[in-house]
């Protein structure tokens, strides 16, 4: 289980000087899907990861050191909160720079063991999410895994949840509002970063 967490630093792009001795978990998804809120819920801290009032405005890569415990043994992992995709109203040139920085970071940051792709459970087949999934698969290494996490599932009824789970069998459904699915997600994160989820 996660017992504590703290903010470490922010980056604009990949920095080889910021190495990590720990496995890392990257949270990706389109703007306003709930990345920061999910990190806060998992770490049981309301304001650990800051949510921007303007979707897509925050374009920093934020790092958090997370201390976990499994069978009385403590260990560290890093959570990485990535900028949201596809929302920011900025110049085309600036957006291209952001995309290039993210592309370089995701491909070169070898300590990332788990990519958590957050998808709004009410909009499951948006082109931006399909493209993001295909993009990650193109450079995924054998020691890395993609996990689809459907957010805001408190907006769905039981039938809709069952249908979604049936269509995406290896996914997790979560709700920050009522904490649904968070324990299962926490277990997967810990097992994957420890190399136990093969």
Swiss-Prot record:
Entry keyword Isomerase: no
Cofactor(s) essential for the protein: Mg(2+)
GO MF annotations in UniProt: GTP binding; metal ion binding
SUPFAM superfamilies: P-loop containing nucleoside triphosphate hydrolases
Protein's GO biological process: division septum assembly
All residue ranges annotated as the EngB-type G domain in the record: 21-195
Domain of life: Bacteria
Record: residues binding Mg(2+): 36, 58
Cellular component GO terms held in the UniProt record: cytosol
Keyword annotations of the record: Cell cycle, Cell division, GTP-binding, Magnesium, Metal-binding, Nucleotide-binding, Septation
InterPro entries tied to this protein: G_ENGB_dom, GTP-bd, GTP-bd_ribosome_bio_YsxC, P-loop_NTPase, Small_GTP-bd
Record flagged with keyword Magnesium: yes
Any Pfam family matching the protein: MMR_HSR1
Residues that bind GTP: 29-36, 56-60, 81-84, 151-154, 174-176
Function: Necessary for normal cell division and for the maintenance of normal septation.
PANTHER family listed in its UniProt record: ENGB-TYPE G DOMAIN-CONTAINING PROTEIN, MSS1/TRME-RELATED GTP-BINDING PROTEIN
Family note: Belongs to the TRAFAC class TrmE-Era-EngA-EngB-Septin-like GTPase superfamily. EngB GTPase family.
Protein name, as recorded: Probable GTP-binding protein EngB
